[in-house]
């Protein structure tokens, strides 16, 4: 009887402990979700502020986000990855918040000025990792590595091929496409330029999908 009573007491202790742990984990998850909601609102406000700082840029971010999500979808990525691709597109230049206006507006930058300008990439990574509380790194990594080139001649770290995070490879071609379209270049021309840069600037799969999307758009207009 004593052994049974002891076993019952132990089982009751572990059941109660498990319940307390579950309650605590639920509270932590709820708090993280609340923090993420706040973080998303903060980053959304920063995107709007950056759009006001650089005329036309907010539309560019939305365009890149839409392209990145569609590429991810066509590559068979899951719902979360597609959502991450969209978020990365919105935030890929968020680090511009920390760059002087004079450097953003000028095109004839000196080597030293261009080095300062390039810091928008790590600044963006730092902003996203600071505000995003769940520990998921896909969006931050996509932003951090989206200026890498598929052949290893990009920046910041000179990564090449599969070493570049997948969403960064998607983001690179989405950014290029939207940027060139906003210069007034035709979808067919941009598609051709992208295909010419396969294995150099862009991953072939993402490049072909982006080119196909542009060709479809050209036919539809």
Language-model-detected regions and their locations in the chain:
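Juxtamembrane or sensor-core-proximal signal-transducing alpha helices
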Residues: 2-30
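Signal-transmission linkers at sensory-effector interfaces
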Residues: 31-46
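Metal-dependent catalytic cores of enzymes that make or break cyclic nucleotides
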Residues: 51-221
């Amino acid at each position: 009887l004593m052994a049974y009573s002891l076993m019952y007491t132990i089982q009751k202790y572990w059941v109660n402990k498990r319940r307390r742990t579950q309650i605590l984990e639920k509270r932590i998850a709820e708090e993280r979700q609340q923090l993420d909601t706040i973080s998303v609102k903060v980053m959304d406000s920063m995107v709007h502020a950056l759009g006001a700082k650089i005329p036309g840029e907010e539309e560019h971010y939305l365009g890149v986000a839409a392209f990145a999500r569609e590429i991810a979808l066509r590559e068979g990525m899951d719902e979360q990855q597609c959502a991450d691709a969209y978020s990365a597109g919105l935030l890929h230049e968020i680090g511009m918040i920390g760059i002087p206006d004079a450097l953003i507006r000028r095109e004839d930058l000196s080597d030293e000025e261009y080095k300062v300008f390039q810091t928008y990439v790590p600044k963006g990574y730092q902003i996203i990792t600071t505000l995003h509380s769940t520990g998921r790194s896909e969006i931050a990594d996509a932003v951090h590595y989206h200026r890498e080139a598929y052949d290893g001649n990009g920046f910041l770290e000179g990564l090449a091929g599969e070493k570049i995070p997948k969403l960064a490879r998607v983001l690179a071609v989405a950014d290029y496409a939207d940027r060139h379209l906003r210069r007034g270049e035709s979808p067919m021309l941009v598609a051709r330029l992208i295909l010419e840069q396969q294995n150099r600037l862009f991953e072939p799969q993402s490049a072909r999908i982006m080119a196909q999307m542009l060709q479809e758009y050209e036919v539809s207009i």
